[in-house]
Amino acid sequence: MSSEKKHVFIIGSKGIPAQYGGFETFVEKLTEYQKDESIQYYVACMNAKRKRFKHNGAKCFNVTVPDVGPAKAVYYDIAALKAVYQYVVDHNIEEGIVYILACRIGPFLKKYVKMFHAKNIQVFVNPDGHEFKRAKWNWFIRQYWKLSERLMIKNADYVVCDSQNIEKYIQEDYKKYQPQTTFIAYGADVVDNSDEEKFEVWAKEHEVSKNEYYLIVGRFVPENNYETMIREFMSSNTKKDLV
């Protein structure tokens, strides 16, 4: 393996090829549109059918995870972290980045950060959103999420936020740790489909005019604030439709 390669290990997504999910799509597009050939990506994949394989030039490796309920994601991240460290040792990699998506393993991270630092490898974290506020979790799990987030921010070398508000929150709530943060927005493939026949039929059926509507796309879960958006739309003076 060339010593000039920049080794970047990504854990925390379910893996690629992406089936669904924001982190999965991020990793899919990051590797698909890679321009810098000096970077070698490694991607952890949960319960993949193959132990090791390549996709978009990334070296993907399977992490087998038992069904242990809500703790499944925590188990997965820790197992992936162990696998990455073993790979680093076995291949004598002495410089690189471990990029962890989401803040699930805060109580366990400090130990691994020290191990990776001994190999001159930095640990980056994407904190995602306010997981500890999600209504689907009970009180105990929400408390764990908040603790885990705090310890992830405390021990990470760098925090990559995909929301300006999340970056502001990290800087304010964890000011005492002086976190090094940056904001990198997600990209998107923008395609003009307004003239497609299916859209024309749908728009006519629902009496929706081109460029005269607001579009919301997302899952119907409490934290996506559909109720707030619909309520505010109804109280506004806009003449446009809401789709």
Residue ranges, per PLM feature:
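A short, active-site helix/loop in glycosyltransferases that binds the activated sugar's phosphate group
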Residues: 153-181, 188-190, 199
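Membrane-proximal helix-turn-helix segments that form the acceptor-binding/catalytic region
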Residues: 141-159
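Conserved donor-binding/catalytic core segment of Leloir-type glycosyltransferases
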Residues: 9-11, 203-224, 230-237, 243
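A short, charged, and often flexible helix/loop element on the N-terminal side
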Residues: 58-82, 134-141
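An aromatic- and histidine-rich active-site surface loop
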Residues: 74-83, 95-128
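N-terminal strand-loop element at the rim of the active site
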Residues: 5-6, 11-19, 33-71, 165-167, ...
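A short, histidine- and acid-enriched strand-loop-helix "catalytic/donor-clamping" loop
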Residues: 68, 104-107, 124-141, 157-158
